Amino acid sequence: MAVKIRLKRMGAKKRPFYRVVIADSRSPRDGRFIETVGTYNPISQPAEIKLDEEKILSWLGNGAQPSDTVRNLLSNAGILAKYNESKSGKKPAKKATTKEASAKKPTDKNTVAEIKAYLDAQGTAYTSSAKKADLLALV
């Protein structure tokens, strides 16, 4: 199910008032929605915007896509910047854990190829015809 964060029009004729809602992308603009996460009143001066930041960040983390107008509202409120920081902050952590895993010393359970890869990473010289026991001795 593709989920969108978009505006649901409320208010009277020529007096728009919008709710920021989480909805299935296939549902109509003013149709069924999953959750209300804010409001937007473009008539008031300045425009009145109320957003539930925690809920929006949660839905963005789950893959919800904001509409163009909602994207602008979130960007002006600074929510998209926080989401992008948290999203990019997670990626280097994953890379660090993979480096740590590859830096562990090999044991008897590792294959010869894994031991050779470890020795190559460490810069240790070995003969290509060396046996597993000889390679483990170099570690």
Curated annotation (Swiss-Prot):
GO molecular function: structural constituent of ribosome
Biased composition (Basic and acidic residues): 97-108
Top-level division of the source organism's lineage: Bacteria
Renumbered residue ranges of the record's region Disordered: 85-108
Disulfide bonds, paired cysteine numbers: none
Leader sequence segment: none
Keywords: Ribonucleoprotein, Ribosomal protein
InterPro entries, per database record: Ribosomal_bS16 (IPR000307), Ribosomal_bS16_CS (IPR020592), Ribosomal_bS16_dom_sf (IPR023803), SAP_dom_sf (IPR036361)
GO process annotations (BP): translation
Any single GO CC term annotated in Swiss-Prot or TrEMBL for this entry: small ribosomal subunit
NCBIfam families listed in its UniProt record: S16
Family note: Belongs to the bacterial ribosomal protein bS16 family.
Protein's name in the database: Small ribosomal subunit protein bS16
The species this protein was found in: Leuconostoc mesenteroides subsp. mesenteroides (strain ATCC 8293 / DSM 20343 / BCRC 11652 / CCM 1803 / JCM 6124 / NCDO 523 / NBRC 100496 / NCIMB 8023 / NCTC 12954 / NRRL B-1118 / 37Y)
